[in-house]
Amino acid sequence: MLDIKFLRTNFEEVKAKLQHRGEDLTDFGRFEELDTRRRELLVQTEELKSKRNEVSQQISVLKREKKDAEALILEMREVGEKVKDLDNELRTVEEDLERLMLSIPNIPHESAPVGETEDDNVVARTWGEVKEFAFEPKPHWDLATDLGILDFERAGKVTGSRFVFYKGAGARLERALISFMLDLHTDEHGYEEVLPPYMVNRASMTGTGQLPKFEEDAFRIESEDYFLIPTAEVPVTNMHRDEILNKDQLPIRYAAFSSCFRSEAGSAGRDTRGLIRQHQFNKVELVKFVKPEDSYEELEKLTNDAERVLQLLELPYRVMSMCTGDLGFTAAKKYDIEVWIPSYGTYREISSCSNFEAFQARRANIRFRREPNGKPEHVHTLNGSGLAIGRTVAAILENYQQEDGTIIIPEVLRPYMGGKTVIK
């Protein structure tokens, strides 16, 4: 959520920056109307309440003096009715303004490339050499099916499309990656491990920006109004909702493994085979709470931490600086890390690393004090995948495949695989 005071005094500037996102700003123009009416109603209501108090005191004086107070009593009733009407209108205006504020995306950072679509994203850097195969490489779903380590067909029978059973060495590879990533981020990168709930309430989804805009993309438990988490970012960020931290606690860095659940409502027909786009998948998420002046340095560190996973796995990748039209709703600046997938002949996203500045913290009311009695300020929040496990499995299977269909296990994972060097 944007700062309403900043928006009020910089309306045209904010509007111009949001236009770079390519968002529909039809409702945005209502801000000035609603904000002005809200402030008018507040003034009118306070004036009438003040008058009501004065009249009430006058009535008390008249009654003590045994004088007729009927006219003033009638006047107070009229004032009370006006206050009630104004309060009702104020409540409606505030609800409309709140809905509008929750629907306004974050302001892009000045360093985000201006553009409309993914074609306008900018390559920040690349790492590793794309392997040239002496044979026609297979897609990971064929490799895994032939090896008996992934079963999409039975998962489709048990649940439906976009689900999978991991079996044997496939299940162990998934588990190895989870342990490897968590060990790396906690032991070397300084994150504290968290194992979060997989269901959250509506306030949590609103705090991180999934609601109200993206409710159709979420799986909801209607009987409880809980949501299955689309990412560990949601529960982990909301750990500190409605809290005031002190500056000595910052930065806070969490690494959280979780399963993630997404309806993929807008992805019909895309990536229908394999692990790239599943309704349920595992991920290690990195979440940070930092002082505002440190957040862009922390974004670079966060991105480097996610990159380090791919470097140790020796998987070629590139880092994209996302343009204003491809930032997503909540980010002020975002990097996507894309790993090379041979069967696609291109790079595919495996991590998004974002700085939300105070956007989420304002929605979730997460603040800190620089001094014991200082005025609370909103923290800046960041998060990034460190990494998506299923897509990492896909990248390993395809990049490490051999002509006979076996898979070389990356050296860094072998201690987690019981010393095995090959999946066959």
Curated annotation (Swiss-Prot):
E.C. code: 6.1.1.11
Pathway recorded for this protein: Aminoacyl-tRNA biosynthesis; selenocysteinyl-tRNA(Sec) biosynthesis; L-seryl-tRNA(Sec) from L-serine and tRNA(Sec): step 1/1
Main location: cytoplasm
Binding sites annotated in the UniProt record for L-serine: 231-233, 285, 385
GO terms, biological process: selenocysteine biosynthetic process; seryl-tRNA aminoacylation
Keyword set, alphabetical order: Aminoacyl-tRNA synthetase, ATP-binding, Cytoplasm, Ligase, Nucleotide-binding, Protein biosynthesis
GO cellular component: cytoplasm
Gene3D superfamilies in the record: Bira Bifunctional Protein, Domain 2, Serine-tRNA synthetase, tRNA binding domain
UniProt cross-references to CDD domains, sorted A to Z: SerRS_core
Catalysed reaction equations from the record: tRNA(Ser) + L-serine + ATP = L-seryl-tRNA(Ser) + AMP + diphosphate + H(+); tRNA(Sec) + L-serine + ATP = L-seryl-tRNA(Sec) + AMP + diphosphate + H(+)
Keyword Aminoacyl-tRNA synthetase on entry: yes
Location(s) in or outside the cell: Cytoplasm
Residues annotated for ATP binding in this entry: 262-264, 349-352
Annotated domain remarks: Consists of two distinct domains, a catalytic core and a N-terminal extension that is involved in tRNA binding.
Function: Catalyzes the attachment of serine to tRNA(Ser). Is also able to aminoacylate tRNA(Sec) with serine, to form the misacylated tRNA L-seryl-tRNA(Sec), which will be further converted into selenocysteinyl-tRNA(Sec).
Similarity section: Belongs to the class-II aminoacyl-tRNA synthetase family. Type-1 seryl-tRNA synthetase subfamily.
Quaternary data: Homodimer. The tRNA molecule binds across the dimer.
Name listed for the protein in its UniProt record: Serine--tRNA ligase
Organism: Bacillus cereus (strain AH187)
